[in-house]
Swiss-Prot record:
PANTHER family listed in its UniProt record: CYTOCHROME B (PTHR19271:SF16)
Cofactor note: Binds 2 heme b groups non-covalently.
Protein name as annotated: Cytochrome b
Gene encoding the protein: MT-CYB
Residues noted as binding heme b b562 in the record, renumbered to the chain: 83, 182
Length: 379
């Protein structure tokens, strides 16, 4: 009798995705982040579900309901901080996952890559709306500032902003709809992740060398299931350490003050994972220009496959491109630092230079360097 896992309509989907999947024999730990992102999504959906049981999306009671969760609900503090810091872990894994894709040329799988870019946008939108829900000072002013950016769109801008707000300012209607969207989006993300995997399994995984691994495949289970479990344990260790020892490390103290439309915080800034994009937004002294740069800073990822000029897929054997890749990483870290600083000298000029370098590296310097490397190898 044929094995049930290979014949049962549901089991064979799981089997062909996680058990008998032919995988390259040489993929490194940089390939662990897909499964870790799946785990992060599951953690966020579960903790979010339990938070939603006690949360009220009303301007009068939202802040109090979060306080109630932390003080009165059994292990409510744990659920709340797992959810808040789980978002940070989610973004760390996301950035490393995208970085891996850029380094090893995984973006050559166009459909997989573009759905990944779409997923990145969806996760960022979800995180932004989630940050508004506790209705603290930074929640309110963050929502006001970011939604206001849409008013830069010519002709329809101001109408669009009022339509999103559901009134003439960020208020009850805004909070209620943000809660609704924040609840539904993770399930859309889960569906998109399924499509992401579907397209990935059409081609099979890339590997560090960037060469075809068709001649040398190993089954996913037990080799990569065990390897993934190690990643999972490290992720859980990091997350629980963060939650139990310093849960507010990555948060903003301003968000422990209830939202007050009459009092603006001295420095409005988003969570750490948006700071690089926020720095790019602020570095352009024009509203529409800043908004365009903000969107393009992520959307530029969709253009990367078309800028691939090298004859090799991976950067593994391309030392000049490697140097530029790490300069790009350093540049993004610089932008993250600048995004959290006040708008004053010398931070303004550093932010502007880092923003210019970011776009120059991806659009101009890296493609030209790849051509130069081809030339060196007489290709």
């Amino acid at each position: 009798m044929t094995n049930l896992r290979k014949t049962h309509p549901l089991m064979k989907i799981v089997n062909s995705s996680f058990i008998d999947l032919p995988a390259p024999s040489n993929i490194s730990s940089w390939w662990n982040f897909g499964s870790l992102l799946g785990l992060c999504l599951i953690i966020q959906i579960l903790t979010g579900l339990f938070l939603a049981m006690h949360y009220t999306s009303d301007t009068m009671t939202a802040f109090s309901s979060v306080t109630h969760i932390c003080r009165d609900v059994n292990y409510g503090w744990l659920i709340r901080y797992l959810h808040a810091n789980g978002a940070s872990m989610f973004f760390i894994c996301l950035f490393l996952h995208v970085g891996r894709g850029l380094y090893y040329g995984s973006y050559m799988y166009l459909e997989t890559w573009n759905i990944g870019v779409l997923l990145l946008f969806a996760v960022m939108a979800t995180a932004f709306m989630g940050y508004v829900l506790p209705w603290g000072q930074m929640s309110f002013w963050g929502a006001t500032v970011i939604t206001n950016l849409l008013s830069a769109i010519p002709y329809i801008g101001s109408d669009l902003v009022e339509w999103i707000w559901g009134g003439f300012s960020v208020d009850k209607a805004t909070l209620t709809r943000f809660f609704a969207f924040h609840f539904i989006l993770p399930f859309i993300i889960a569906a998109l992740a399924g499509v992401h995997l579907l397209f990935l399994h059409e081609t099979g995984s890339n590997n560090p060398s960037g060469l075809s691994s068709d001649a040398d495949k190993i089954p996913f289970h037990p080799y990569y299931t065990i390897k993934d479990i190690l990643g999972v344990l490290l992720l859980i260790l990091t997350l629980t350490s963060l939650v139990l020892f310093s849960p507010d490390l990555l948060g903003d103290p301003d968000n422990y003050t209830p939202a007050n439309p009459l009092n603006t915080p001295p420095h409005i800034k988003p969570e750490w994972y948006f700071l690089f994009a926020y720095a790019i937004l602020r570095s352009i002294p024009n509203k529409l220009g800043g908004v365009l740069a903000l969107v393009l800073s992520i959307l530029i990822l969709a253009v990367v496959p078309f800028l691939h000029t090298s004859k090799q897929r991976s950067m593994m054997f391309r030392p000049f491109s490697q140097c530029l890749f790490w300069i790009l990483v350093a540049d993004l870290l610089t932008l993250t630092w600048i995004g959290g600083q006040p708008v004053e000298h010398p931070f303004i000029i550093i932010g502007q230079l880092a923003s210019i370098l970011y776009f120059l590296l991806i659009l101009v310097i890296m493609p030209i360097t790849s051509l130069f490397e081809n030339n060196l190898l007489k290709w």
